[in-house]
């Protein structure tokens, strides 16, 4: 027999559950997209194109992921009022397809202009001033570039790339060739590629994935980071790479307008994703909460026909998912790089009125780059306004610790180059450049093949910079387009 006080307690529990459900009504969606970066926003727009009604859940207060843009008041008569300090350049896949460099399903130039407007793509321009400084000693470093050796090295390197043509677009799920599992420093040494130090610097060190003598990453990843398609930035016509008018964020602002604010949930923390297994017909359930400016929270719950996980799938970031054993085994092999970026105001009688890049250099390194952690570079593409700053670490440092290191680096830049500086914003790019570790790459069945096999299992799809071998936006957008075209039949 239930005692009266026990019955009252049960009623309180029922009322509590009912009140929670009343405050948090379940919303049904055909697709729930977790993550509002390049992968999540692009796949959501492509899904809407095909008649779907996606919702995007983003943990930050803005969408765009690694696409960071700061706006400022330009001098009178000038029109550029932005500086990108995350993603700055886009590969033009229309031009790459025309020249036979890779096979791309989505035209990045048309895709960007769709959300910004016509004539929104801008050609890449060089800097007025490029300097190399050892930011530990303050010494000015003059790169030793031998044109003959460089041309010979380029010929050898292009031949090497021709042996792995899939590096141009990263669409490869076969067994990784064993020679590409060497560190890039060891792989490159017999071929005399040191003459390409400045080129590898651009795609290795400057991009935040490699440092020192490039022994920290397999050759596989450097060949993809400096693939024939990416190399067009330096060697191809100006039309093969572009910037965008209004800065990188303008692309994602346009995507947000297309999707509608009611379909984008910002400051969203997903706490639980429960999916259907085996013969169950239940749809995935997704729960979490949003955080307001005052710190208060609101719960949400979605019933989703399909779920797209559109952020790098590290185990730490998948704690909310009821992972299968296969998923857990695969994603336990995912690693990330430690990259930081921000914006600073500077004063410099030497640099004022110029576009420039001041790069950290270490002449004791074979590739003239430091071993980290520290500042990579500071620079801007126009001759006025604030400066973007980049930094790299070989360990996962807290932002405050990294800020202390780069402040020291700034202070070591000679005063004739830099008079003063004021760092305005600085943060870590979390889950940057996700990649599979060396042990998993050594298996006969590539982890990229295993990732491809997971698509659609348990009504879940995975798209992020992990799907290809490099984290360029063109690769992410292209992968999103392929997944939508392959697994989501048009509802129109």
UniProtKB/Swiss-Prot annotation:
Keywords: Glycoprotein, Secreted, Signal
Keyword Protein transport found: no
The species this protein was found in: Acanthamoeba polyphaga mimivirus
Domain of life: Viruses
Stretch forming the signal peptide: 1-22
UniProt GO cellular component terms: extracellular region
Location in the cell: Secreted
Glycan attachment positions: 92, 97, 119, 146, 213, 267, 458
Protein name according to UniProt: Uncharacterized protein R656
A molecular-function term among this protein's GO annotations: oxidoreductase activity
InterPro entries: FAD/NAD-bd_sf (IPR036188), Flavin_MAO (IPR050703)
SUPFAM superfamilies, per the entry: FAD/NAD(P)-binding domain
């Amino acid at each position: 027999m239930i005692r009266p006080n026990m019955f009252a307690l049960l009623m309180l529990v029922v009322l509590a559950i009912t009140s929670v459900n009343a405050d948090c009504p379940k919303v049904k969606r055909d697709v729930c997209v977790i993550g509002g970066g390049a992968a999540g926003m692009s796949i959501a727009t492509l899904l809407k194109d095909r008649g779907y009604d996606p919702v995007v859940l983003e943990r930050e207060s803005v969408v765009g992921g690694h696409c960071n843009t700061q706006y400022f008041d330009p001098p009178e008569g000038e029109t550029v009022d932005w500086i990108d300090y995350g993603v700055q350049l886009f590969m033009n896949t229309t031009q790459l397809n025309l020249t036979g460099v890779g096979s791309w399903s989505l035209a990045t130039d048309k895709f960007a202009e769709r959300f910004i407007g016509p004539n929104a793509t801008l050609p890449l321009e060089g800097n007025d001033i490029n300097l190399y400084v050892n930011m530990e000693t303050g010494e000015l470093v003059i790169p030793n570039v031998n044109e003959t050796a460089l041309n010979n090295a380029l010929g050898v390197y292009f031949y090497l790339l021709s042996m792995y043509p899939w590096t141009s677009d990263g669409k490869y799920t076969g067994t990784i060739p064993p020679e590409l599992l060497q560190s890039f420093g060891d792989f490159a040494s017999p071929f005399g590629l040191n003459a390409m130090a400045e080129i590898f610097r651009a795609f290795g060190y400057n991009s935040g994935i490699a440092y020192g003598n490039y022994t920290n990453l397999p050759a596989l990843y450097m060949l993809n980071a400096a693939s024939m398609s990416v190399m067009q930035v330096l060697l191809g016509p100006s039309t093969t790479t572009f910037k965008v008018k209004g800065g990188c964020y303008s692309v994602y602002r346009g995507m947000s307008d297309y999707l509608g604010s009611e379909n984008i949930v910002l400051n969203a923390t997903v706490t639980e994703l429960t999916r259907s297994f085996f013969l169950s017909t239940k749809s995935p359930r997704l729960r979490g909460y949003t955080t307001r400016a005052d710190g208060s929270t609101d719960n949400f719950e979605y019933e989703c026909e399909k779920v797209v996980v559109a952020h790098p799938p590290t185990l730490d970031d998948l704690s909310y998912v009821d992972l299968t054993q296969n998923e857990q085994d695969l994603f336990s092999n995912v690693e990330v790089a430690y990259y930081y970026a921000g914006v600073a105001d500077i004063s410099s009688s030497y640099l004022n009125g110029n576009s420039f890049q001041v790069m950290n250099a270490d002449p004791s390194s074979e590739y003239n780059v430091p071993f980290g952690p520290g500042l990579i570079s500071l620079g801007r593409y126009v001759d006025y306004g604030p400066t973007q700053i980049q930094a790299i670490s070989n360990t996962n440092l807290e932002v405050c610790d990294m800020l202390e290191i780069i402040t020291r680096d700034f202070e070591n830049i000679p005063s004739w180059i830099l008079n003063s500086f004021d760092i305005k914003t600085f943060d870590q790019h979390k889950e940057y450049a996700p990649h599979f570790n060396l042990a998993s790459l050594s298996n006969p069945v590539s982890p990229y093949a295993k990732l491809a096999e997971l698509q659609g299992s348990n009504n879940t799809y995975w798209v992020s910079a992990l799907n290809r071998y490099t984290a360029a936006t063109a690769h992410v957008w292209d992968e999103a387009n392929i997944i939508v075209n392959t697994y989501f039949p048009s509802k129109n």
